[in-house]
Amino acid sequence: MARYTGPSWKVSRRLGISLSGTGKELERRPYAPGQHGPTQRKKISEYGLQQAEKQKLRHMYGLTERQFKNTFNKAGKLRGKHGENFMILLEQRLDNIVYRLGLARTRRAARQLVNHGHITVDGKRVDIPSYQVSVGQVISVREKSAKNSAIAESLEVSSFVPEYVTFDAEKLTGSLNRLPERSELAAEINEAFIVEFYSR
């Protein structure tokens, strides 16, 4: 399944979450596209709930189904809870860390920064959004990209940086100082549904 590249607000309304992180998509019309008003939806089956939860998380991080499933399988080989490990692995993606540092306003924009070669890891350019960032690695904006307008605009509006990352706005560098705890990740996601979905 290819990555969705259409309007994110449509997916946000269908899934009931804000993919942009601003919540603006749901302010005016907090119901699915195609509905003529906030009417009650049909009762969803258990399978439907599980699938919807999977779609929420997949679209949140902007992954294809194949990327999502591969990461899920990788998480299953680690010690601990499968669902939590899965969410932590998603959080360790380079494009997500760039987003968490405030260098991009959305994960989609962060993925473009990485793809276009604006980001380095430990001083070496990395243009693979799925690159897994390890604790202690230094993420920086390339010197040639320091005046990138998209980065500057994002830094002007970004204020919240999670405790598990550190960021130096003057040097445009940051790092993953520890793995996040489950309580620090998306509270609106029930990862148990996703584990159940793939366990069928």
From Swiss-Prot:
Gene3D superfamilies named among the record's database cross-references: Ribosomal Protein S4 Delta 41, Chain A, domain 1 (1.10.1050.10), RNA-binding S4 domain (3.10.290.10)
An example molecular function term from Gene Ontology annotations: structural constituent of ribosome
Pfam families assigned: Ribosomal_S4, S4
Swiss-Prot/TrEMBL keywords: Ribonucleoprotein, Ribosomal protein, RNA-binding, rRNA-binding
Gene Ontology CC annotations of this record: small ribosomal subunit
Domain of life: Bacteria
SUPFAM superfamilies on file: Alpha-L RNA-binding motif
A biological-process GO annotation: translation
S4 RNA-binding domain sequence ranges: 92-170
Chain's role: One of the primary rRNA binding proteins, it binds directly to 16S rRNA where it nucleates assembly of the body of the 30S subunit. With S5 and S12 plays an important role in translational accuracy.
Assembly and binders: Part of the 30S ribosomal subunit. Contacts protein S5. The interaction surface between S4 and S5 is involved in control of translational fidelity.
Protein name stated in the entry: Small ribosomal subunit protein uS4
Lineage: Bacteria, Bacillati, Bacillota, Bacilli, Bacillales
